[in-house]
Amino acid sequence: MTTLLQISDAHFGTEQPPVVQALLQLARDQAPDLVVMSGDITQRARRSQFKAARAFIDRLKPAALLTIPGNHDIPLFNLALRAFAPYSNYSRAFGKNLEPLFESANLLVIGVNTTRPYKHVDGELSPQQIERVADRLRRAAPSQLRI
């Protein structure tokens, strides 16, 4: 059986140590095959917050990791960074792929980035993203759970 651990809205920068410890213990107990960090990894997309998030992931030691940014993972107040390099701090911690894919014999997880640097709320999907996901789902193996 495949085990997936999804963590959403961690908001590093406002994290509570007891919650972090509980998550680490849960991960140790469950030994997930995949950890998904699904947006709002940080509170304000600051470099220090991404460093803390990366340190947390390093402590988890996941077998596999899939991350996608949330609206809190692009700068809100640093307008220059938001306009010209909105994902730079995210990419430094988690790589440049904003829409990663995880695939195994019985699992397909498609990461979809709904953030837009020009707006800080109400994520959206483009027609190209919808088509890309639909196409990939059509090509999934019958044995794969699709997420």
Predicted regions and their residues:
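Active-site neighborhood of phospho(di)ester-bond hydrolases with catalytic His/Asp-centered motifs
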Residues: Q6-S8, V35-D40, A64-N71, N113, ...
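Alpha/beta-hydrolase fold active-site loops
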Residues: T2, L107, L145-I147
